[in-house]
Structure formats: C-alpha cells, structure tokens
C-alpha cells in the first residue's frame, strides 16, 4: 500500500546538539530531535510502532524498535499532525538516524511511514 495516496504520512525531523547534557571527555554526545508526523492521506491512521537505525561516526549501528512514540500511539485524522521530541546519546561527535513508523489505517490497512536519514552533528565554532 506504499504507493496508494490514501495511506501517506509525512515525517519532518529537526535535530539539535545538547551541549549542556554532553560530556565529550567521556565520549557522550547528547542530541535531541523534534519530529512532526502529518497524515497526508485520506484515511485516519494510528502510529503503532517505531523502528530506528542509529549509526555513529565510527559506523557502529544500533537498531531501536518499540511501540508508539514517547509512550503514545497517536491517531491522526487526514491533515492532522502530531509533534514530539526525543533524544539519543552517541559516543562520537556525529552520526545519523533513519527509520520508519508502522501505521494502521482505520480500514485495517497496514503501511509504513518512512523517516529519511538525518544527521546528528556537533556544531563547529569558528575562531
């Protein structure tokens, strides 16, 4: 059902570095990411699960799977959006995340909402 326009969810991500929660000397780099999930289809749908692939700057990859997001399984009418913020710790100054959400439409159709890869990076300071 991925190509059926009735079942379409758009995902926008805004990552940021959390300097105050990071300890670079210990290899701990904290990042937050704010996500906007919008039902761009024609059928109400519920986000039931998340699947993330997190890769650090050394190429180490971790898979994270779970029910819903931030303790919720949001139900979205057509045009409706859900926002949340979460975070991740890396051992390197940069990395990336990508993944998808498992969705179930009110008519029972299961489909995937892809999350394009986005970069997590410590901003550089110019001197």
From Swiss-Prot:
GO terms for biological process: error-free translesion synthesis. Pfam families: DUF525. Signal peptide: none annotated. Residues 3-127 form the ApaG domain. InterPro entries: ApaG_domain (IPR007474), ApaG_sf (IPR036767), Uncharacterised_ApaG (IPR023065). PANTHER family: F-BOX ONLY PROTEIN 3 (PTHR14289), POLYMERASE DELTA-INTERACTING PROTEIN 2 (PTHR14289:SF16). This is Protein ApaG. It comes from Xanthomonas axonopodis pv. citri (strain 306).
């Amino acid at each position: 059902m991925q190509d059926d326009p009735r079942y379409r969810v758009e995902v926008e991500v805004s990552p940021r570095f959390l300097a105050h929660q990071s300890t670079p000397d210990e290899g701990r780099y904290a990042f937050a990411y704010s996500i906007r999930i919008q039902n761009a289809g024609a059928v109400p749908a519920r986000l039931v699960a998340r699947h993330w692939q997190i890769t650090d700057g050394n190429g180490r990859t971790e898979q994270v799977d779970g029910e819903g997001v931030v303790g919720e399984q949001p139900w979205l009418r057509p045009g409706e959006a859900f926002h949340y913020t979460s975070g991740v710790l890396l051992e390197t100054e940069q990395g990336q995340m990508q993944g998808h959400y498992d969705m179930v439409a009110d008519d029972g159709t299961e489909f995937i909402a892809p999350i394009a890869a986005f970069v997590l990076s410590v901003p550089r300071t110019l001197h």
